[in-house]
């Protein structure tokens, strides 16, 4: 249960660099565990020197206290025995930070009848036992909402359920036996809503091994839009624990209020009635083949094309031309929505992402430490408040920044703005009108995105060679 995925759980001696419990020394494995746990579930971004060498360990203490508070432990700020024991417990793989009973933005299914498919099976249990466990897990949520579920045997369902080991194609590899048991994604298109179970676990229907019904009930709560709860009585509490009454799970009031805030109560006399809070209108989800579609930013990332719009982005890969649709927060939780510009400086294997007067550096699915920074650190004058578009030209190792009717050129090698800039866009890119939304450099051409149109520009001939719809990259 993680939030680009949702996962079910889950050095040399460290002297004064890390808070210790009494005179106990933490061994390498304990420190590795603590570091990985805080990074994975509490968004801790360590600095090697600070983490292992500085005596001022307040950032570490705060993260330990944050973990202790969420999981209901005594807030000592130290790696005491109770804290280390909790870190060893199997749990959901979704991070605990966020403070939402539902996911940010409250994603939900826009219908009450939801399909699911069990794609493959664990060898630990008979197929019919797996079928029954999943059906009962969904029934837990069905009993307190208007939702109904139906299973299909082929094709794509709203919720695709599968068993896998290690790296399985979603940036959230499983870790073998223990700790992260499973993960699921919040509602949405593509792999959103799907639930993955670590097949390295020993799945069971009783107290031995890992109880599939209990884990599935938790994970499918994520598939319906619920986040983690810090209530130990809640089914959505992230740490796994077997209940002897597992055949008759009773949702906590926290669980009921969370799911009913998304879908309402079950329309029957025996349903638990909970007032449904008013919900602010959510931003519309962009439609890829909308003829009026425009993009906020466009870039490449390690050979893939990324097209950003509001809270979402499309991802088109070389091996799968059908674009995937994702929430920005699912890959980069700390990035804002409604981006202004993005470009890949692939000589540095990173993407710079801009919004307002700030920018972030991203490598893979990690936002780099030390960001955001102010755009003026790149050499812009104080009069520049935001960037409209940016693009990197690999052959020249130059980045072009477009602002209004002008553009700047940045030397990536020297990390300085080139002299003689800004210049008018129309002087050097004839046929391209000011106020560019996004720019992409690919196949020897510049592609300028302006509203719902894009212009293919040949830099050698200094002319526009084609005019296309912006979303033609999305097979529209």
From Swiss-Prot:
List residues binding Zn(2+): 92
* InterPro entries named in the record: Hemopexin-like_dom, Hemopexin-like_dom_sf, Hemopexin-like_repeat, Hemopexin_CS, M10A_MMP, MetalloPept_cat_dom_sf, Pept_M10_metallopeptidase, Pept_M10A
Q: How is the cofactor bound?
A: Binds 2 Zn(2+) ions per subunit.
Gene Ontology cellular component annotations, sorted alphabetically: extracellular matrix; extracellular region
- Report a single Gene Ontology molecular function: metalloendopeptidase activity
Give the positions the UniProt entry annotates as the active site: 219
- Intracellular or extracellular location(s): Secreted, Extracellular space, Extracellular matrix
Instruction: Provide the E.C. number(s) assigned to this enzyme.
Output: 3.4.24.22
Residue positions of motif Cysteine switch: 90-97
The stretch of residues making up the signal peptide is 1-17
List the catalytic activities from the record.
Similar to stromelysin 1, but action on collagen types III, IV and V is weak
Q: Name one GO biological process term.
A: collagen catabolic process
UniProt keyword list: Calcium, Collagen degradation, Disulfide bond, Extracellular matrix, Hydrolase, Metal-binding, Metalloprotease, Protease, Repeat, Secreted, Signal, Zinc, Zymogen
What the record says about its domains? The conserved cysteine present in the cysteine-switch motif binds the catalytic zinc ion, thus inhibiting the enzyme. The dissociation of the cysteine from the zinc ion upon the activation-peptide release activates the enzyme.
Family the UniProt entry places it in: Belongs to the peptidase M10A family.
Q: What does this protein do?
A: Can degrade fibronectin, gelatins of type I, III, IV, and V; weakly collagens III, IV, and V. Activates procollagenase.
For this entry, the protein name equals Stromelysin-2
What does the record give as the organism's lineage?
Eukaryota, Metazoa, Chordata, Craniata, Vertebrata
């Amino acid at each position: 249960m993680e939030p680009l995925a949702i996962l079910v759980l889950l050095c040399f001696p460290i002297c004064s660099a890390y808070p210790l419990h009494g005179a106990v020394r933490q061994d390498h494995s304990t420190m590795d565990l603590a570091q990985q746990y805080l990074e994975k579930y509490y968004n801790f971004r360590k600095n090697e020197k600070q983490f292992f060498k500085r005596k001022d360990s307040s950032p570490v203490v705060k993260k330990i206290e944050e973990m202790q508070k969420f999981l209901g432990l005594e807030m000592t700020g130290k790696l005491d025995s109770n804290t280390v024991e909790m870190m060893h417990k199997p749990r959901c793989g979704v991070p605990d930070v966020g403070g939402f009973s539902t996911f940010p933005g409250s994603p939900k299914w826009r219908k009450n009848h939801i399909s699911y498919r069990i794609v493959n099976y664990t060898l630990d249990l008979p197929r019919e036992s797996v079928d029954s466990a999943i059906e009962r897990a969904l029934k837990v949520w069905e009993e307190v909402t208007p939702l109904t579920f139906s299973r299909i045997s082929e094709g794509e369902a709203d919720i695709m359920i599968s068993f896998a080991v290690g790296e399985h194609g979603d940036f959230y590899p499983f870790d073998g036996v223990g700790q992260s048991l499973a993960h699921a994604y919040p509602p949405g298109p593509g792999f959103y809503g799907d639930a993955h179970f670590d097949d390295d676990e020993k799945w069971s229907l009783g107290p031995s091994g890992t109880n599939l019904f209990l884990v599935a009930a938790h994970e499918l709560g994520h598939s319906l839009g619920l986040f983690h709860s810090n209530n130990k009585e809640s089914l959505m509490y992230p740490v796994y624990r077997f209940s002897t009454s597992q055949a008759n799970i009773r949702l906590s009031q926290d669980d009921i209020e969370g799911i009913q805030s998304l879908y309402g109560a079950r329309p029957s006399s025996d349903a638990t009635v909970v007032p449904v809070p008013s919900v602010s209108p959510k931003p519309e989800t962009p439609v890829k083949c909308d003829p009026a579609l425009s993009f906020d930013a466009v870039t490449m990332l390690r050979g893939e094309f990324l097209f950003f719009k509001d809270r979402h982005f499309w991802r088109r890969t070389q091996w799968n031309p059908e674009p995937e649709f994702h929430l920005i927060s699912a890959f980069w939780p700390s990035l804002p929505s409604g981006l202004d510009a993005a470009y890949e400086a692939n000589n540095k294997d990173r993407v710079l992402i801009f919004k307002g007067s700030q920018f972030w550096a991203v490598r893979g699915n990690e936002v780099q430490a030390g960001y955001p920074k102010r755009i003026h650190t790149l050499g812009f004058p104080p009069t520049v408040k935001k960037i409209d578009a940016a693009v990197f030209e690999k052959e020249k190792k130059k980045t072009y920044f477009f602002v209004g009717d002008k553009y700047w050129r940045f030397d990536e090698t020297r990390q300085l703005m080139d002299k003689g800039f800004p210049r008018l866009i129309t002087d050097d890119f004839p046929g391209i009108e000011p106020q560019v939304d996004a720019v992409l450099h690919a196949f020897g051409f510049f592609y300028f995105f302006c509203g719902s149109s894009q212009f293919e520009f040949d830099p050698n001939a200094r002319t526009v060679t084609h005019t296309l719809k912006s979303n033609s990259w999305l097979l529209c």
